[in-house]
């Protein structure tokens, strides 16, 4: 699900201090919003903000030094036409950057069309970077998943599995081994660009871990600030299963790495069988270390296949 609402006044207040901007025109349009169709079709926040461009409607139009020069350095008729064309773009907001002064005709147009216009001394490139990052997160596709999300050896790992397999207890043991908790039970994931999924904890569950028989534990209070994380990029899913499930649904040694689709992004996945006596925490850390090697281009399975092929060739040649 992708949220599709952010109004001009919300955007203004969010960056009143960072961008030190002023609301110079269109004060009566505080509820003006992004076009919902444009938001749904946008691949990321980068599609929703940019320099003044007449072929990209429905986005925040940034007016820097060059854009203002283009609007005013022409005959009076051309200036009027160029400024009037901005209305057809239906921008949610106009932003004057680079300490530029708005031409009177532009101010009048914003008042007539009720288009909010903000002005800042910051550079246009900086404004675009800041707004793109904000809009990418605000309008990101999102989903809530059940599991324990952790920082294990610097990698964002989601532990999933059937109920009663001890996911939270496993999380507690991993925390005691120096890893960090992001979220327990419910994890909010956001696709912030085409290949990146970021996860964080809902505010209501911040720092909390539920362990059966003990109850709710405040991990930050018990283990300290370094035992919790605000957010992490999802890089691996560890799925816990019972023996019969593993034998029925999964190969013992899969030829291709397993993946799971999360918001349209394939995420690496490993399956670990839960049996009495197994040290699951050690197995999870081993899976994470192996994933780190894979991300660096080191594939142990493919190296084994190549080693086996060479051995077969040597045997056939002898």
UniProtKB/Swiss-Prot annotation:
Protein name listed in UniProt: HPr kinase/phosphorylase
Residues engaged in binding ATP: 161-168
Residue segments, region Important for the catalytic mechanism of dephosphorylation: 273-278
Function: Catalyzes the ATP- as well as the pyrophosphate-dependent phosphorylation of a specific serine residue in HPr, a phosphocarrier protein of the phosphoenolpyruvate-dependent sugar phosphotransferase system (PTS). HprK/P also catalyzes the pyrophosphate-producing, inorganic phosphate-dependent dephosphorylation (phosphorolysis) of seryl-phosphorylated HPr (P-Ser-HPr).
Entry's free-text remark on domains: The Walker A ATP-binding motif also binds Pi and PPi.
Organism expressing this protein natively: Paracidovorax citrulli (strain AAC00-1) (Acidovorax citrulli)
Signal peptide: none
Catalytic function, reaction form: [HPr protein]-L-serine + ATP = [HPr protein]-O-phospho-L-serine + ADP + H(+); [HPr protein]-O-phospho-L-serine + phosphate + H(+) = [HPr protein]-L-serine + diphosphate
